[in-house]
From Swiss-Prot:
Keywords: Ribonucleoprotein, Ribosomal protein, RNA-binding, rRNA-binding. It comes from Synechococcus sp. (strain RCC307). GO terms for molecular function: rRNA binding; structural constituent of ribosome. This is Large ribosomal subunit protein uL22. Belongs to the universal ribosomal protein uL22 family. The gene is rplV.
Length: 118
């Protein structure tokens, strides 16, 4: 039995500063919600990672509108994931000649939107 997959528009944000766990905490809350609800939630969440996530979400909706001709008002966040990016390592001078390592983490954000089954 052949099933036709609904079109999915993707957008990626690569090398975003922030840890994967903190970004996933936000993505888990918007997955499965409509585009409008997701934007409202992101606007009022108190997390720093909502800025880059909002940019990637808007890019995914723009891709759906421009490339596939879909209406933004009935789009749903069907896929939202964050993968680990490279870690920048820096050193901080400490007392008595020691140096502590500072890890500046990055992640890759992927968001996909599909039309709502109405």
């Amino acid at each position: 039995m052949a099933t036709t997959a609904s079109p999915q528009a993707l957008a990626h944000g690569r090398f975003v500063r922030g840890s994967v766990s903190k970004v996933r905490r936000v993505l888990d809350q918007i997955r499965g919600r409509s585009y409008r609800d997701a934007l409202i939630m992101l606007e009022f969440m108190p997390y720093r990672s909502t800025g880059p996530i909002t940019k990637v979400l808007r890019s995914a909706v723009a891709n759906a509108e421009h490339n596939m001709g879909l209406d933004p008002s009935n789009l749903v966040v069907s896929m939202a994931s964050a993968d680990m990016g490279p870690t920048m390592k820096r050193y901080r001078p400490r007392a008595q000649g020691r140096a502590y390592q500072i890890k500046k983490q990055t992640c890759h954000i992927s968001i996909g939107v599909t039309p709502q089954d109405a």
